[in-house]
């Protein structure tokens, strides 16, 4: 997955996904967390900020320059002013323990290398304050759409006469939970998106994780 691909899809994505598909989850988190500093990891054009715009100090990062341009447009439209930074999520330009909370919606499953996925989550833990919480979503390997696709599909996106392909690493609940624990987070809960209404969670489209950096955590862990 390259910056160029996300730069290309940014205009269409701005119109296609103008509202977060996790509005219910983010509403609950805004109430749970109440106020503080919040980092949006892989913020794209910014719809996942909306639930936090009134009571939080907002920061957003993305490696796509064009996505961040649309995030400025989006935040201006809805009357909030996040600090937006272009960077690599594997090397965050923030001090240790800088943020009270974080969200990362549909971000880490775009990282192809296993070690780099862990590195990115270790960076997230580093910039969270001890006791700080993060909400992470990942695509589920066992959603019906990908039953026969393997763990690493490429998903097409059409831009006029061009088709670009987005890489995904698909997680099972077990793999997702193992990864965040390996990064040193405490898993509070894992659950499907609110629009999924079946009794067995393992076939949901998304895996949602609420995690916490332990109060006694050491950055070297």
Per-segment meaning from a language model:
Residues 1-35, 39, 44-91, 115, ...:
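Class I (Rossmann-like) S-adenosyl-L-methionine-dependent methyltransferase catalytic domain
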Residues 101-115:
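A short SAM/SAH-binding and catalytic strip from SAM-dependent methyltransferases
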Residues 65, 96, 109, 113:
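Active-site acidic-Proline motif in GNAT/NAT acetyltransferases
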Residues 73-76, 100, 104:
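Short, amphipathic alpha-helix enriched in basic
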Residues 118-130:
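A short glycine-rich, Lys/Arg-flanked "PGG" loop and its adjoining helix->strand segment in the class I
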Residues 4, 106, 119:
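Active-site phosphate/pyrophosphate-handling residues
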């Amino acid at each position: 997955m390259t910056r160029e691909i996300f730069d290309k899809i940014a205009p269409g994505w701005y119109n296609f996904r103008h509202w977060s598909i996790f509005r219910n989850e983010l509403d609950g988190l805004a109430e749970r967390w109440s106020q503080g500093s919040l980092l949006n990891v892989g913020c794209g054009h910014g719809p996942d900020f909306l639930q936090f715009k009134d009571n939080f100090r907002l920061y957003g990062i993305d490696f796509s320059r064009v996505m961040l341009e649309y995030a400025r447009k989006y935040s201006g439209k809805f009357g909030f002013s996040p600090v937006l930074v272009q960077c690599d999520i594997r090397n965050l330009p923030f001090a240790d323990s800088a943020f009270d909370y974080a969200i990362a919606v549909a971000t880490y499953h775009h990282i192809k290398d296993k070690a780099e996925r862990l590195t990115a989550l270790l960076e997230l833990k580093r910039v969270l304050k001890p006791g700080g919480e993060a909400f992470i979503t990942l695509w589920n390997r066992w959603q019906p759409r990908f039953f026969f696709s393997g763990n690493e599909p490429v998903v097409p996106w059409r831009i006029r006469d061009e088709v670009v392909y987005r890489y995904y690493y698909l997680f099972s609940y077990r793999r997702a939970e193992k990864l965040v624990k390996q990064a040193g987070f405490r898993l509070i809960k894992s659950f499907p998106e609110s629009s999924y209404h079946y009794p067995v969670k393992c076939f949901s489209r998304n895996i949602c994780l609420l995690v916490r950096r332990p109060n006694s955590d050491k950055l070297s862990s």
